[in-house]
Amino acid sequence: MKYRLSDISTIISGGTPKKKVKEYWNGSIPWITIKDFNAKKTNSFTNYISEKGLNNSSANLTKENDILISSRGTVGKLLMVKSGMAFNQSIYDIRTDTKKVNSDYLYYWLYKNIEEIKQKVHGSVFDTITRETFDLIEIALPDLSVQSEISSKIKVIDEKIEANQQINDNLVV
């Protein structure tokens, strides 16, 4: 069955606390920008915000297995979230409806189809993914059990690639 991406997920916008208010920054909540998208999964952050910064801005928190996508500037970078973090307004959080789609399956599908997705962006000066873009992205989904089976197989291969990359990185040093 075919679905629009917006029908199988909740699209959540990010935000930035006011930089001038010092008590909004250097807290315990990781705050991610596109610059922090250095791998498929990230555990390193350059900025942290406080609870007060989160509550007094349009920033939102991710949940485990959410998918982040860069929406401005460098459009289409993807990140699978493994823990809660806040994010800026140049990123959308795709929170899947787990009754319809497996998060890993959707992540791999987006990764494979990112060039096609980039063709749906808007903007006169800069390419931008907007909320409307998610209505234009259609995905044919197999049953959840098939999605899980496919994503499990890809994940094993992906983990081997990451392990080999780590070995290569260590050899360079």
Where do the language-model regions lie?
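DNA target-recognition domains and sequence-specific DNA-contacting regions of bacterial/archaeal
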Residues: K2-I139
